[in-house]
A protein has these predicted regions:
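Hydrophobic beta-strand-centered segment that forms part of the acyl-chain substrate-binding groove
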Residues: 52-89, 115-117, 123
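Non-catalytic linker/capping segments at the edges of enzyme domains
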Residues: 1-38, 64-67, 79-83, 95-101, ...
């Protein structure tokens, strides 16, 4: 999960910057990997998707009556490992929207170094 209360939201540009503090207490570190803990790539992607969902939920009316789901991931790349003690800065921006679908570009940085990037589609449906 991204950390609460750490989002910088620019509604005009439809972009957000969020923060994820990576601690050794994360349960996934028990098995990934016991002697060399590395944050799983799928969880880096999940933090990017959560950040993007915050944008969508702020843009739609009655967000409590909707679900946002990830419908496609393109060009997901990991450039560097994320380890306990790292602080991930996640940037997500809407680059295209049509009806109930949103295309995002997202990057993750640790200490100003690019560690991951992806493009993805998210869709909104009523509950």
């Amino acid at each position: 999960k991204i950390n609460k209360g750490t989002a910088l939201w620019n509604k005009d540009k439809k972009e957000i910057k969020t923060l994820k503090n990576v601690t050794i207490n994360e349960p996934f570190f028990l098995g990934h990997f016991p002697d060399k803990p590395i944050m799983p790539g799928v969880l880096i992607l999940e933090s990017m998707a959560q950040s993007a969902c915050l944008i969508i939920l702020d843009l739609i009316e009655n967000p409590e009556n909707h679900l946002v789901y990830l419908s496609k991931v393109n060009n997901f790349r990991i450039y560097s490992n994320v380890i306990p003690g790292d602080q991930i800065i996640i940037n997500a921006k809407i680059v295209h929207e049509k009806l109930n679908s949103f295309k995002f570009e997202s990057t993750c940085h640790v200490n100003d170094k690019l560690v991951a990037k992806a493009e993805f589609l998210a869709s909104v449906i009523k509950r």
